[in-house]
Amino acid sequence: MRVIKGNKCDWEVVIGLEVHAQVISNSKLFSGASAKTYDAPPNTQVSLFDVAMPGMLPVLNEYCIYQAVKTGIALSCKISKYSAFDRKNYFYPDLPAGYQITQFYYPIATEGKVVLEDHNAKEVRIARIHLEQDAGKSIHEFSQTYIDFNRAGVALMEIVSEPDLRSVEEVAEYLKKLRMILRFIGTCDGDMEKGSFRCDANVSVRPFGSNELGVRSEIKNLNSIRYVMQAIEYEANKQVNILENNEIFTQNTLLFDVSLGQTRVIRTKEDAHDYRYFPDPDLFPVKIDDQYIDHVKSLLPELPLQKRDRYINDFNLNKSDADILSSDKDVAMYFEKVVEKHDARLAASWIIGELFGRLNKLGITIDESSVKAEHLIQLLDLIVDNTISGKIAKQVFDMMFESGKLPALIVSEHGLKQVDDADVLYVVVEKILKDNASKVEEYKQGKEKLFGYFVGQVMKETQGKANPEMVNSIIKQQLESK
């Protein structure tokens, strides 16, 4: 969708994103009320400050500063040595003070980037990261509107990109990469369904090749990547149709109607002066020195791209497997536990090829899996020491998911131990070759593919429990002697 074909010209889509990421913190940005509000009954996680009771003053949560600085460092931002809070004035029922405390003039971080590897390592510039309060939640029922103030005052990081994105595919990768980084460093859980990672999209179009930005629309509160893509695609095409018909296009704020797949105007877009920003007189500026920044850097965990490169270089994994295993913090931790005891490629094969398939079928995450890393280690132990074959191991794996039992116990209970007694296997092989005398003759006449058939028959006879290497060796010896 980088270019939309028009009758007059080709149109380029220009997109900038504002992501509102809820800060992982025990308490709110300026009060001691709990920030764990998602499942809480309405208006139970609220302080007097959150509902703007007279005389209540804000007290800055220092941990939110730490989380914002950590985010800025992870996104290659410049951390501001001086940042300050401002009041953004507007009226809405779920904003009891009549203003939102934000950082308009002096944000906490600027000039960062997110690299889109799937789009030729394109760098999407991050203009700024600032801290601000979330608003409450309006709940509409029939003719009544209720206000839940649990969310009011929860800390948000607004991460604002430059208008560098040119397609919905780039948008999707940007959001996934950004969410992955925030999850890895533990500053936001990235759960769009719960509203802790929301996106506003600024969309405009211009004749392809032009350097001037067109009139933009802002689509508010998009809570899934799929909806972000649908909303942008619809809005871009709508703008092209308006401009192609020589109609006047005005700057608006929009909502995306999921059921109709269309955007609709909720208000004419305001400019900054409409909000009458001014410094909050109740809050001191925030001053951050190099020592503090270095301290936060020292606590920063390994980032996803660094982890992926380490998996490729240290474990000799291919890029595809390394990408998958480094894309989620819980998956990476699971993999690294298994790698402490077993070969990395064996571990990767079982996690990606076997574990993920079962997790997807059950619709659960790796953190919710009944088969923990310790259990997979025990299963791989049984394969490596030839207690069971790889084929039997897959059966055991299924039973582990169903019963939650340890692999060694399952093998013992079901008699699944690998047959590695040479005398027993000689008898089985002799029987198979005797029962298939005609095929033995065909094999001797050059039909070498039948070797696999003989192996398969032995495995069938032993219910998959025969040691594959021993079976191959014995069959080869028997055939050569005939």
Curated annotation (Swiss-Prot):
UniProt catalytic activity: L-glutamyl-tRNA(Gln) + L-glutamine + ATP + H2O = L-glutaminyl-tRNA(Gln) + L-glutamate + ADP + phosphate + H(+); L-aspartyl-tRNA(Asn) + L-glutamine + ATP + H2O = L-asparaginyl-tRNA(Asn) + L-glutamate + ADP + phosphate + 2 H(+)
Nucleotide-binding keyword on record: yes
InterPro entries (alphabetical): Asn/Gln-tRNA_amidoTrfase_suB/E, Asn/Gln-tRNA_Trfase_suB/E_cat, Asn/Gln_amidotransferase, Asn/Gln_tRNA_amidoTrase-B-like, GatB, GatB_C_1, GatB_Yqey_C_2, Gln-tRNA_amidoTrfase_suB_CS
Highest taxon of source: Bacteria
One of the Pfam families matching this protein, by short name: GatB_N
EC number: 6.3.5.-
EC category: ligase
Entry's Gene Ontology molecular function annotations: asparaginyl-tRNA synthase (glutamine-hydrolyzing) activity; ATP binding; glutaminyl-tRNA synthase (glutamine-hydrolyzing) activity
Annotated disulfide bonds: none
Keyword Nucleotide-binding: yes
Alphabetical list of PANTHER family matching this protein: GLUTAMYL-TRNA GLN AMIDOTRANSFERASE SUBUNIT B MITOCHONDRIAL AND PROKARYOTIC PET112-RELATED, GLUTAMYL-TRNA(GLN) AMIDOTRANSFERASE SUBUNIT B, MITOCHONDRIAL
Functional note: Allows the formation of correctly charged Asn-tRNA(Asn) or Gln-tRNA(Gln) through the transamidation of misacylated Asp-tRNA(Asn) or Glu-tRNA(Gln) in organisms which lack either or both of asparaginyl-tRNA or glutaminyl-tRNA synthetases. The reaction takes place in the presence of glutamine and ATP through an activated phospho-Asp-tRNA(Asn) or phospho-Glu-tRNA(Gln).
Family of the protein in this entry: Belongs to the GatB/GatE family. GatB subfamily.
Subunit organization: Heterotrimer of A, B and C subunits.
Protein name: Aspartyl/glutamyl-tRNA(Asn/Gln) amidotransferase subunit B
Organism in which the protein naturally occurs: Ehrlichia canis (strain Jake)
Gene expressing this chain: gatB
